[in-house]
Amino acid sequence: MKGRLTAIKNIAWAFAIVICLLAVFVGLLIAAFTRSGEEQFRAVPLGTKTTVKEEVVETGTRPADQSDGTLKTLAETTDAGQEYIDSLVFLCDSTLIGLRDYGILNGGTATTQVWSTPSGVISARDMADSKIVYPNDGSMITAANAAMIVQPKILVISMGNDGLGGIDQFEFMPIYKSLIRSIWENSPNTYIICLPLSSVTVDYAGNDGTTAAKCSEANTWIQTVCEETGAYYCDAMSAVQDPSGVLLQEFASSNGKTLNSTGLNQILQYLRYHAVTMD
């Protein structure tokens, strides 16, 4: 009988020891998880600065996309020569379409230096996504796609005159900015030169709402876009305007808006003496 009681007592002690060990083990687990949770979710006191790690994506070298918030203009230079003019590509609306249609540039009317529509008209509202005639094969593609193929060294943009009367600053600027950025996305090493609007003559009789005052206002929009993107602004149209910004009759075609051959040659001359200096 005594031996049986001793055996029962030993079993009870063993059971108690197991229970104690389990309790210690559970306690250690709880402590470990609590410490981990505190370290992971510890509150940051108000006023404490936290640092968020950002991923930096390199977009490539863009010679003109170096905006510091200032307007980059082209100062007067020595004569860059005909070779410089031959290196330019013009993305233009009806203002400069005579460069192609009058055969003024290298290649005559078949020049590959002018990107525009068959008619030469591109509405200001359609600047960013209008399709142009790709002169190398005659296909209709966007200017951004043409830039991707050609990778032009210098692209001169002369757009915004067509349909200007029906668009305001808040629509014009994002569209113009989108055009520039789409070109750089496809041709990051291209220097972009933006020209102001040529304006209209004092007796312009068009019914599109375009006036000399509206053109002067739009030129400030283009300047702001250049400041924000880093594109160059070249005041070439001053060569064909009077001091008030009105297009001089001697440089205008019969419609009082687009440039005639004399006016176009004035623009080319201005560009020759206000050239981009390559890095």
What are these regions (language model features)?
Residues M1-L91, T95-D101:
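N-terminal secretory targeting modules
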Residues Q169-L179, C215-A218:
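Charged helix-capping and loop-helix junction motifs
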Residues G160-D162, W184-S216:
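Active-site segments of SGNH/GDSL-like serine hydrolases
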Residues V200-D279:
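Catalytic His-Asp segment of secreted/periplasmic serine-dependent ester chemistry enzymes
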Residues T78-E171:
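Conserved SGNH/GDSL esterase-like catalytic core that processes O-acyl groups on lipids
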Residues Y84-S87, Q151-L155, S187-I192, T229-Y232:
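Loop/turn elements at helix/coil->beta-strand transitions in domains of secreted/extracellular proteins
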Residues T117, L195, A236-A239:
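Conserved beta-strand termini and adjacent loop/short-helix elements that scaffold enzyme active sites
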Residues R100, I104, G160, K177, ...:
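Sec-exported extracytoplasmic/periplasmic mature domains
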